Amino acid sequence: MGQKTHPIGFRLGAIRGWDSNWYSETNFQDKLVEDEELRRYLHTRLKRAGLSRAVIERTPERVILTLHTSRPGVVIGRGGSEVEKLKGELETLTGKDIQINISEIKRPELDATLVAKNIVQQLEGRISFRRAMKQAMQAAMRMGAEGVRIRAAGRLGGAEMGRTEEYMEGRVPLHTIRADIDFAQETALTIYGTIGVKVWIHRGEILGKPDLSPNVQAQQRKMKESPQQRRQRRGG
């Protein structure tokens, strides 16, 4: 009773691609744990670089990381020095060949992870939670969001008793699969205890089948095509 569907998991394969794109019949659990270790290390190492997502693809030769960040210059560094240093650190961590691709987030105000991290940073800096939440919501709406919902829970403002406060503007249709809902949750560590922050951002509707990860897209096409369609595509 009362359980909610995760907005991103609900849309996987429809309008949202996976963050891990690989398949393994052996050592699956080891690779899954390695993915989590990589993401944990990246989010700690690139805390100031505005890292939102780390998409991981695996080939027999290497691990391919695509970093979605709002500050690519910080990740790359002068003449690519920082990204080469990061590549070496990750290769030492995993013992595998690493390839790093950088994808810039053009509008960070519409990225739920970056918005949640920004609110957490302000809460840890003792900024009023109402001010932080309302400013983030207004910035997202100015950048073209169709709806924003932000929730904070804990000892807000240092109150004796924990409570939950939520602000919402516009539409956030969680059960419309074509609605592009970005979701994130982060935790602020304050002197009064932890404060949980959740952010939902409705960025409009996606009509038709979007282009997901190249590997996943190729697998889906192979499953859907008939032998005759495959011969026509190859020109046979």
UniProtKB/Swiss-Prot annotation:
Task: List, alphabetically, the Pfam families matched.
Answer: KH_2 (PF07650), Ribosomal_S3_C (PF00189)
Q: Which UniProt keywords apply?
A: Ribonucleoprotein, Ribosomal protein, RNA-binding, rRNA-binding
CDD domains with a match to the protein in the record: KH-II_30S_S3
**Region annotated Disordered, chain positions:** 211-236
Q: Where does the KH type-2 domain lie?
A: 38-106
Q: Which NCBIfam families match?
A: rpsC_bact
**Protein known as:** Small ribosomal subunit protein uS3
Gene that produces this protein = rpsC
